[in-house]
UniProtKB/Swiss-Prot annotation:
Binding site for ATP: 17-24
GO molecular function, one term: ATP binding
SUPFAM superfamilies registered for this protein in UniProt: P-loop containing nucleoside triphosphate hydrolases
Name used for this protein in its record: Thymidylate kinase
Enzymatic reactions: dTMP + ATP = dTDP + ADP
Name of one Pfam family that matches: Thymidylate_kin
Keyword annotations: ATP-binding, Kinase, Nucleotide biosynthesis, Nucleotide-binding, Transferase
Function, as annotated: Phosphorylation of dTMP to form dTDP in both de novo and salvage pathways of dTTP synthesis.
EC number in record: 2.7.4.9
Organism (species): Thermosynechococcus vestitus (strain NIES-2133 / IAM M-273 / BP-1)
Enzyme kind, highest EC tier: transferase
Length: 241
């Protein structure tokens, strides 16, 4: 299985979704499952170290951690275009310093949010031009896309109720309900456009059932990918198409 979204041997999995979808919980559950089911041991046996990069946007690098604080947890008024460019700066650093090196060595990247969130939040939510966002995403990533996008979808009211239980929300969570409805529509549009790489997961159910659905989706994908990975690594072809 050769990825059409990047030329590297590794596997790039992204979790997307609106507020309160449970992405953080599922990131940890997936990492535990990958370890317990032997997938990370298989990668170690192929001398892939580390076998898994568990990361997020914004905030996947030291620079990104500072940008995350500014974007999500400051009281500053940020212009929508400035916000878009700050997310792009975070992503450019993240791809260069974290995501691409991990994929080059043949490992798995599991990322909480990526380019789709920018389209959904800054495009559909804020109303910025989608072509401009696409161009900026292309610049920030160098065209590096995810192999599999797991979209944790649930009604906006349910997700926001979950976030309210955590206390005062971050800058994005504090937006009006109409904003979050537009964001959800953005994810829906992206899922329809990228149906070969997107998998909708019903997040309006208990966390263990969400985890089970994700595991079932990942299992077949991992088997196909790993067979190709072994051939590429054995042949010394980690980076090349």
């Amino acid at each position: 299985m050769h990825s059409a979204t990047h030329p590297y041997a590794g596997l790039f999995i992204v979790l997307e979704g609106g507020e309160g979808a449970g992405k953080t919980t599922q990131m940890g559950a997936i990492a535990t499952w990958l370890e317990n089911s032997g997938w990370l041991a298989k990668l170690r046996s192929c001398h892939v170290d580390p076998p898994l990069l568990l990361t997020r946007e914004p905030g996947g690098t030291p620079l990104g951690q500072g940008l995350r604080q500014l974007l999500l947890h400051s009281d500053l008024a940020i212009d929508p275009l400035a916000e878009l460019l700050l997310y792009a700066a975070d992503r450019a650093q993240h791809v260069a310093m974290g995501i691409r090196p991990q994929l080059q060595r043949g490992g798995i990247v599991l990322c909480d949010r990526y380019t789709a969130s920018t389209v959904a939040y800054q495009g559909y939510g804020r109303g910025l031009d989608l072509q401009i966002i696409q161009h900026i995403n292309q610049m920030a990533t160098g065209g590096l896309g995810a192999d599999l996008v797991l979209w944790l979808d649930l009604p906006v009211a349910v997700g926001l109720a979950r976030t309210q239980q955590r206390g005062r929300g971050d800058r994005l969570e504090q937006n009006a309900v109409a904003f979050h409805e537009r964001v959800r529509q953005g994810f829906l549009a992206l899922a329809q456009q990228g149906s070969d790489r997107w998998q909708r997961i019903d997040a309006d159910q208990p966390p263990d059932q969400v985890t089970q659905a994700i595991q079932e989706c990942l299992a077949a994908h991992l088997h196909r990918w790993f067979e190709t990975l072994k051939q590429r690594l054995t042949g010394g072809d980690r980076d090349l198409p």
